[in-house]
Amino acid sequence: MDLVNHLNDKLLFAIPKKGRLYEKSVSILKGSDIKFHRSARLDIAISTNMPVALIFLPAADIPMFVGEGRCDLGITGVDQVRESEVDVNLPIDLQFGTCKLQVQVPVAGEYTSPEQLIGKTIVSSFVNLTKKYFAQLEGVPESEMVTRVKYVGGSVEASCALGVADAIVDLVESGETMRAAGLTAIATVLDTSAHLIESKNPKGDVELLRTIKSRIEGVMTAQKYVSCSYNAPENKLPELLKITPGRRAPTISQINDSGWVAVSSMIERKNKGDIMDDLKKNGAEDIMVFEISNCRV
């Protein structure tokens, strides 16, 4: 990472280097109009339109780089932040990579509650979070806990079947891998998702930092909302505005038709079908929904 030491005029943004987190992160960058080209063999890419350097790192390493102020911003999971035990800001939930860090035991086994695992052997790649969880369960400091926690970097779900562990603590998204391994969850240690994380001692330009955060907030809002427009009879406007109150307030415009107005409002994407149906039932006409490619809120 010696090259980073020579990028003093750039804001350093740590990005997961592979997998679904990488793909989703790149989508966020594109939506934020941070343009770049990444060479196949390099883990650093310079933005072509902003004074930003993208540093591609394993997701588990990003909290350390941001926490130590080596990078100004990063994208990684809350699980990685908590496991790393670093002090960073988490300004934006990016709403992908959503999963649970759970205590899992064999389906056909004797354990049905985490309390039964006190004094047993637990395997996880999240050793710090696992120790903290079981120390709290035992009501003692970590140095005095009797539960044994072992680190395994991958294929954690095989540990019980191989006799290495009585239980595991691992991430669960859909649960398919867990069920395929003959495991079931009996407790949740942490709910997690990908977040934008920010150094508490950024070295990059503070105004640029604010701009990037604002752009990413705009991308997230555009993903959550759509724009809904319709024509409304003035005598039914109060009821229709209850259906589409907007983020702050709807926009109401006069049209060249006596007794009618045009209404435009932001509505949640997930509810757009029901909202359009309700508008129609309450007298609205010419109801249209438009995508929001980006915005500032």
From Swiss-Prot:
Name the HAMAP family for this protein: HisG_Long
Q: Give the GO molecular function terms.
A: ATP binding; ATP phosphoribosyltransferase activity; magnesium ion binding
Record GO biological process: L-histidine biosynthetic process
Q: Where in the cell is it found?
A: Cytoplasm
On the tree of life, the source organism's domain of life is Eukaryota
What catalytic activity is recorded? 1-(5-phospho-beta-D-ribosyl)-ATP + diphosphate = 5-phospho-alpha-D-ribose 1-diphosphate + ATP
PROSITE patterns the UniProt entry points to: ATP_P_PHORIBOSYLTR
What is the name listed in the Swiss-Prot or TrEMBL entry for this protein? ATP phosphoribosyltransferase
**Enzyme Commission (EC) number:** 2.4.2.17
